[in-house]
């Protein structure tokens, strides 16, 4: 019993619109962070072919993308075997202020890359800055830290959702 692509995209976009209707900056930060993951991986690989010290920042960018993936999608910590120390380190970012600091530190690292050469890594720095700003606004306005409400497998009441959750439970 396979999921249709249409139902998956329908669930994603309905969850996305529900998240934006909540007007919570931590959700905005999470979505900007997810976009940052894609940008980190794509632009990190694209800039790795420079014949200068930019290669170092490209490698850092790829690593940042992988770490942000684990921060924004913590279920991957259960799937992938990591040390307890690393897992606890990632779990420290389950609040607005720590995530704000995490993203702003990542942004600062990528902003430093401009000193070497202006490359497309500036886009990653901008997105990290925006994500950090969203988490900072959430913390300043005392909004609670929320996670996205997207259910890729469907709502728990639907047959697809129940099957999807059962499959995920069996995998974990």
UniProtKB/Swiss-Prot annotation:
Its main location: Golgi. Golgi membrane protein involved in vesicular trafficking. The chain crosses the membrane at residues 25-45, 48-68, 100-116, 123-140. The gene is TVP18. This is Golgi apparatus membrane protein TVP18. Belongs to the TVP18 family. One of its GO terms (cellular component) is Golgi membrane. GO terms for biological process: vesicle-mediated transport. PANTHER family: CALCIUM CHANNEL FLOWER HOMOLOG (PTHR13314:SF2). It is found in: Golgi apparatus membrane. Keywords: Glycoprotein, Golgi apparatus, Membrane, Transmembrane, Transmembrane helix. Pfam families: Cg6151-P (PF10233). It is a multi-pass membrane protein. SMART domains: Cg6151-P. Glycans are attached at residue 24. It comes from Scheffersomyces stipitis (strain ATCC 58785 / CBS 6054 / NBRC 10063 / NRRL Y-11545) (Yeast). The keyword Transmembrane helix applies. InterPro entries: TVP18/Ca-channel_flower (IPR019365).
